[in-house]
UniProtKB/Swiss-Prot annotation:
Abolishes the inhibitory effect of tetracyclin on protein synthesis by a non-covalent modification of the ribosomes. GTP binds at residues 10-17, 74-78, 128-131. One of its GO terms (molecular function) is GTPase activity. The gene is tetM. InterPro entries: EF-G-like_DII (IPR053905), EFG_II (IPR041095), EFG_III/V (IPR035647), EFG_V-like (IPR000640), G_TR_CS (IPR031157), P-loop_NTPase (IPR027417), Ribosomal_Su5_D2-typ_SF (IPR020568), Ribsml_uS5_D2-typ_fold_subgr (IPR014721). Residues 1-242 form the tr-type G domain. Keywords: Antibiotic resistance, GTP-binding, Nucleotide-binding, Protein biosynthesis. Belongs to the TRAFAC class translation factor GTPase superfamily. Classic translation factor GTPase family. TetM/TetO subfamily. CDD domains: Tet_C, Tet_II, Tet_III, Tet_like_IV, TetM_like. It comes from the Bacteria. One of its GO terms (biological process) is response to antibiotic. Gene3D superfamilies: 3.30.230.10, 3.30.70.240, Elongation Factor G (Translational Gtpase), domain 3, P-loop containing nucleotide triphosphate hydrolases, Translation factors. SMART domains: EFG_IV. This is Tetracycline resistance protein TetM.
Amino acid sequence: MKIINIGVLAHVDAGKTTLTESLLYNSGAITELGSVDKGTTRTDNTLLERQRGITIQTGITSFQWENTKVNIIDTPGHMDFLAEVYRSLSVLDGAILLISAKDGVQAQTRILFHALRKMGIPTIFFINKIDQNGIDLSTVYQDIKEKLSAEIVIKQKVELYPNMCVTNFTESEQWDTVIEGNDDLLEKYMSGKSLEALELEQEESIRFQNCSLFPLYHGSAKSNIGIDNLIEVITNKFYSSTHRGPSELCGNVFKIEYTKKRQRLAYIRLYSGVLHLRDSVRVSEKEKIKVTEMYTSINGELCKIDRAYSGEIVILQNEFLKLNSVLGDTKLLPQRKKIENPHPLLQTTVEPSKPEQREMLLDALLEISDSDPLLRYYVDSTTHEIILSFLGKVQMEVISALLQEKYHVEIELKEPTVIYMERPLKNAEYTIHIEVPPNPFWASIGLSVSPLPLGSGMQYESSVSLGYLNQSFQNAVMEGIRYGCEQGLYGWNVTDCKICFKYGLYYSPVSTPADFRMLTPIVLEQAFRKAGTELLEPYLSFKVYAPQEYLSRAYNDAPKYCANIVNTQLKNNEVIIIGEIPARCIQDYRNDLTFFTNGLSVCLAELKGYQVTTGEPVCQTRRLNSRIDKVRYMFNKIT
């Protein structure tokens, strides 16, 4: 049986969950349609998803049509959950990008399409909700050509009156774009030679698989228009990116999930081989795990299975598998382009509404961060506060709702702040000698620090010979440096800095690596105090797409938000403004753009790097370390 994995992607409220329900219903996988409004769909499982009518976590279901099994990945549609989208894209054989006939191409549509093209995933456009009043498909086509790609093949004609129907074009009506994109075919056509349908179909298929041509279909998921045709298209156009024939096992973990009973599930896409129940499988060329239970989706339901074949998505109950772990032969994993996960830019303090639920909250955050690497947290050793870092305010709302719904913990969140970093201002050196008070450690250490250009990251080198100070002591110094760089003079991580281990002395046999590990961050702090540090804040590169009449306002308002305009371009009826902006200002700038353009603007942003902050220094409370803080205090007092 052929197995293909497809993604359903769209902007918020374009109808992707409803489309999934219609595909399941029309294929016979389910006997009754679920409803987003009633909260009865197969793929929106959390209370927040049902209440908001949006998808937050990746949902997986399936149907069978003739000799093909189709696994459907119903992905999120909000910017704060793009990491969930990106993790899912890597397992897809193809994608359906939904566009609402009423709303056209939205900001999120552009972001998702960019990701699909970057990762080389064949994509079909599906214009949904064509049965709504006031629809002008020619405007939607133009919107797609201007904002996504001009290389579309409209495969159907839509008759709105007297009875709405969708019919396939005849061959002669759909080949223009295919011919125009191939010089040989165009020359043959212009010379009057006949073109065989087979060579046109082959050309379309090649360009479709190469993501340089995008077939376009129509329908209404809610009214069940065009769904049967879409099922035929899915099963015939998409190919499985798997190794055919006998081969070693290879699979990749793309999702971790915890059930309400706290069972830990790992979702795995198999790319080659066969996975059997009770198999012992090597993970990422390291330890082995034993397959004790295995599930997959069959006609919309999770079912136990005893074997799974190449192309399948399987679910294992396992405590050790991590996101991106590879089962079996790592060399057989397809080499797809990767999209970097967005970098958490905000942090806040969280506490349970009921103090007695603190341990429950920490246990819950451990599970949530295990399944979502963009959520990070730590407990401040000074204040004992729980600090969360995350992407955006919607993600923060989702975490709050998830904690309440699944873990029965209500929380209180403080206003989020931007995550800063630090860099030394100048070169400096500092040495602490053995047996010289107040040094209590059996070690002498000398370190130098030097600022590096922005974006360089951390560099380390040792001038102390391994012949004198062996590897275990050298490793201890590196560990101490890593720890010391976690908190600069303002309490933030230190970056863009070169640190050199210039001098070391030990007494045998009393000195231990622990002495060097403990002393290193104290020496490093004194070097930073001599050098001074400056505060760096995250900057985003952004692109604003807006109607041309709003150019002046968008351009002139940028300095109010500390934005620097780098370039402006005119394309079709739009202006594209390219620039840089502090992360702390992006949300206000977006809100302003949305307001004065009446919602017609799109602002895309991603982390560019860190720059010296222009505002007042923002301090973060230093985390305590009982073993070295007394010594730190003594050195700070004498310097």
